[in-house]
Swiss-Prot record:
Domain of life: Bacteria
Cellular compartments annotated: Cytoplasm, Nucleoid
Residue segments, region Disordered: 1-20, 87-108
GO cellular component annotations of the record: bacterial nucleoid; cytosol
Subunit composition and interactions: Homodimer.
Protein name stated in the entry: Nucleoid-associated protein PSHAa1202
UniProt xrefs under Pfam families: YbaB_DNA_bd
The keyword Nucleotide-binding is annotated on this UniProt entry: no
MF terms in GO: DNA binding
Amino acid sequence: MFKGGMGNMMKQAQQMQDRMQKAQDEIATLEVVGEAGAGLVKVTMLGNHNVRRVELDESLMQDDKDMIEDLLAAACNDAVRRVADETQERMGKVTGGMQLPPGMKMPF
């Protein structure tokens, strides 16, 4: 009886590991758009945190360099936050709401 229970538990752990790997693969290709300055600056970021595109509104070309740099940083930070939110939501679905410790990734 113990062997059957342990075997079932191992099977469930493997299934969860497979689902988490699939979710991680999907997250890596996820695209989010971070914005700053009411959409004047947009940063498109992939789920693996690679920046794919930066868009600047034409009206910014007349503004000073410091403001543009601040808006770019804010848009990047917004994109990073959005990736983190999406990752948490998708992984929560896979783990049934069980929160993994920070930095812990599946598969182990």
